[in-house]
């Protein structure tokens, strides 16, 4: 960094400045998770009040079994729609409470068709849900919803309807993109 005459050369100085800026940018870009400190308003659906989420799912016409995640200790809800069982996970929680968001999620074990290409095909035209392939080749489809401040019943019913619609689309998508074994079996018939 120092030249032989004791002065800092311009290249070294520029690298030092750029490194400092990169470190500062990284520090400021870290997400700050907001805790929902306010009580959940009457007839609102809030991740900070897991029972309100379960009640909202039931009000939309679906089952909702509230429990705790064995992995995180955070609340979770088990439900079903369009022939699929799914979970609702709670995030940005402090000791399993004051959660800020929820994630509707369904997971599938590897059937030989769970590839990044399959996930990219789904993600290329789905706005409200994301498909991802894990290291173990399991496939997950999820839909994240922030609830800080709460959602009214009509808004939350719309969220649940969008998720149910995505599950119906998922069924159609899997029929159009069968696993290799299922595709081979269909070709034999």
Model-identified regions with their sequence ranges:
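Long, continuous compositionally biased terminal/linker segments
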Residues: 80-111
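Short, internal acidic amphipathic alpha-helical interface segments
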Residues: 36-38, 100-142
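N-terminal signal peptide c-region/cleavage motif recognized by signal peptidases
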Residues: 29-31
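Sec-dependent signal peptide recognition
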Residues: 15-22
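Charge-rich, low-complexity N-terminal segments
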Residues: 33-83
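A short, solvent-exposed beta-edge/loop patch
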Residues: 127-171
